[in-house]
């Protein structure tokens, strides 16, 4: 079958976006892996699928698949690309839309300057909500990795994150520790591993080793999780500029039981059609 797609990115975190509203899209894990393959397919970190909403009062359904073919709960950079895509494709003329994801409703908004702000929902910290194997809900957990004990904050932004503070993201052992943290036995569903350098109380640098994709140029939910973790630890104040390898995001959080707001760009690189 022939499938139309758009190639997009948010700060270098790149996506193949599929319109499941105007074309039938039902792909096997093998086909998803083929699409994501940078040598034989289109190439991307994740595949985003736009579908009709399954409930009233919601505009669209948003599904996310990693490069390994597995479906995941949430992707912040993808959410920005999602709202840009549905506007550019004429699927809606609303500046703010309500979108259902695997883990709840999000409300991305297209700003006048072309950036997109996404209400990423309320962060969760209880170990059972991550999920993370621990008895207590504490701000810092000790995680044994590669003969080291790491001070780690665990946060769910609809998907699981483990965040640690490092002296420098340039020398952080992302390639070594990232996959070990991702598959650590205390995270039953695996985890995204964040490495955060504090610049000042309103700025950080961040690298993220993403679950199922490896290190990416940027991770929206990872940026949210890092800022939330830093604020809870008393290291940061909202709003925070997050500098990733792909560019900058602005993250704002008002505290417990309040949603995290993420603002940043979304870019269409090209459109095309592929035979599957």
Curated annotation (Swiss-Prot):
CC per GO annotation: cytosol
Catalytic activity: (2S,6S)-2,6-diaminopimelate = meso-2,6-diaminopimelate
Single annotated GO MF: diaminopimelate epimerase activity
Pfam family name, one: DAP_epimerase
Superkingdom field: Bacteria
Subunit structure comment from the entry: Homodimer.
NCBIfam families with a match to the protein in the record: DapF
HAMAP family xrefs: DAP_epimerase (MF_00197)
Protein known as: Diaminopimelate epimerase
Gene name linked to the record: dapF
């Amino acid at each position: 079958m022939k499938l139309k797609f758009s190639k997009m990115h948010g700060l270098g975190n790149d996506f193949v976006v599929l319109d499941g509203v105007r074309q039938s899209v039902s792909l096997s894990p093998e086909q998803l892996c083929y699409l994501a393959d940078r040598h034989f397919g289109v190439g991307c970190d994740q595949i985003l699928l736009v579908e009709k909403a399954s409930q009233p009062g919601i505009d669209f359904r948003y599904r996310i698949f990693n490069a390994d073919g597995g479906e995941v709960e949430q992707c912040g950079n993808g959410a920005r690309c999602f709202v840009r895509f549905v506007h550019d494709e004429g699927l809606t003329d609303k500046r703010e839309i309500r979108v259902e994801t695997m883990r709840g409703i999000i409300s991305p908004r297209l700003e006048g300057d072309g950036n997109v702000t996404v209400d990423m929902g309320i962060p969760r910290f209880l170990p059972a909500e991550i999920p993370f194997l621990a008895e207590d809900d504490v701000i810092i957990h000790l995680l044994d990795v590669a003969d080291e004990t790491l001070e780690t904050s665990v946060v769910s932004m609809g998907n699981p994150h483990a965040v640690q503070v490092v002296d420098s993201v340039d020398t952080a052992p992302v390639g070594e520790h990232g996959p070990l943290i991702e598959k650590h036995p205390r995270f039953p569903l695996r985890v995204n591993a964040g490495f955060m350098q504090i610049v000042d109380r309103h700025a950080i640098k961040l690298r993220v080793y993403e679950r199922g994709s490896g290190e990416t140029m940027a991770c929206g939910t990872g940026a949210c999780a890092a800022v939330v973790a830093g604020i809870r630890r008393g290291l940061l104040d909202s709003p925070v500029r997050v500098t990733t390898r792909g560019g900058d995001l602005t993250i704002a959080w008002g505290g417990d039981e309040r949603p995290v707001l993420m603002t940043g760009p979304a870019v269409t690189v090209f459109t095309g059609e592929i035979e599957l």
